[in-house]
Amino acid sequence: MNHKRRQFLAQSAAISVAAAASWLTHHQLNRPPPLAVRRIGLPLGHQLRDAAFWDAPLPRAQDCDVLILGSGAAALSALWFLTRQGQRNVILAEGPERNGNNAAFVSGELRAPGGAHYLALPSRESVALREMLADLGILESGAESEVPRFRETDLVFAPMERLRYQGRWQEALLPLQDDDSRRFFALIQRLKRAHGRDGRKVFAIPIVLSSEDSEWRALDRLTFADWLAREGYRSPTLLWYLDYCCRDDYGAGAAQVSAFAGLHYFAARGHGSEAVLTWPEGLAHLSQLLRERNGLQPLAALPDETTLHFAQPVAINASAVRIRETDDHVEVLLRDNDSGTLTLLRARQVICAMPLMVAARVVEDAARYGLLAGRGDYAPWLVSNFVLHRFPTEGAGDALAWDNVIYGSGGLGYIAASNQLIRVAKPARTVFTAYSALNHADPAAVRQWLLAAPDAELLAFAAQDLTAAYGRRFWRAVEAVDIGIRAHAMRIPRPGYLDDAQLAAVRAHRSRLHFAHSDLSGYSVFEEAAFWGVEAAQRVLAQG
């Protein structure tokens, strides 16, 4: 057993013991709250892995124009661009989860993120995304400036963040300002303005616009932790903070991600603003705005017609289980997510807006497109929503923030959804959303644990930051808990990701089957997904 796995199992056991004690005390005083554990994408994901649908009898085919597979950021961005250009005869198959990693959690009148919870203010290079936000009324003016004007109600409200450090809460997530931290952030200010010998920004979002200068791209040959050590950074608090940022954005720590990715996180957006765009339900709010803007209409079932035509784009609750391209169309076998009924569509063009690891399992002759099964590491996450019938008691002088982080924790902290509500009085009930990136062992080993772990162990991981902040008394406020397991939540930008041959091949492919996903950038943020969605839509329109 390797050291990483021993460390992971030891930490699991320690947290489980602490959680068991916390639960025992809670059970003695209260009835345990309902707990739902959702393994998102199962069992369909394993059926696709095992090629369960390749020999399925085919139903009668129906013809359609443009078909989008998926409903995450790339899919809805592609649909936004198509409808903006007048292409409205579009079918969107939602995929296994509505809105993908931007899903919402809903409990009665309460809303919270079920996945991604914020959008950083987009860089000047994110032209299409800025246009999209302007279309939605979120970006009010200055779309071409360094920092445009955004609608105040869409920006994170104060207090934005706090860190529990040495037994006390403080405002900033960086624990201390010391010589190392000042040196590091002075470097970041220079890197924000740095250009390679080809004249392009060294660090840009979208990442494909970054410089290809070999001297800078050499950073992609070592890990961020190795680079930090080489450059003489020793401050424990700075190193913890940088590792936390990597886990928060990439699902893996500084010892696992590329040095280029580690610096890109801080330098790519160019502007100095730390504000973000967010809503109570996270990026599900943005997804819903895009659905409404695009006029996307849900259909319980497709009409029984040989040729399908729609005046407005329609959405069906189905997932692609097989894709085959021919000379004059793309044949897609869809499975209804509820009934399991199979539908066969022959589309003139298809935008495949799903993770590349999934596309490699469902596309016939996947290697033709550069898709290779088993390539790329994906980080497993827990996104856990704690429904509270009252707010936990804060210490004297302490104020709950939107983002609440515990120094030294294996978790990523918790989000208070109610922070974004516009109201005079604090609501009686609320939701705290806890995030955990499980990077303590090899992702495959973690996924095996996630499949078999008892609910109490999962809850222990989910609740570790909340019990660290409030102690056992936290459970007295808990009404219910929902744990979403995202076993392949995001692609990890490990050393070598900039020159990944698979990604280069898929990006270069041109045919009736277009790929659009943040995976094409080697890491997962909304800006990258939106970029690839718009790129795919432009190729659809160019082919007529």
Where are these regions (language model features)?
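Beta1/beta-strand and adjacent pyrophosphate-binding region of the FAD-binding site
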Residues: 60-72
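Mid-domain catalytic core of redox enzymes
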Residues: 316-432, 469
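Glycine-rich FAD pyrophosphate-binding loop
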Residues: 83-106
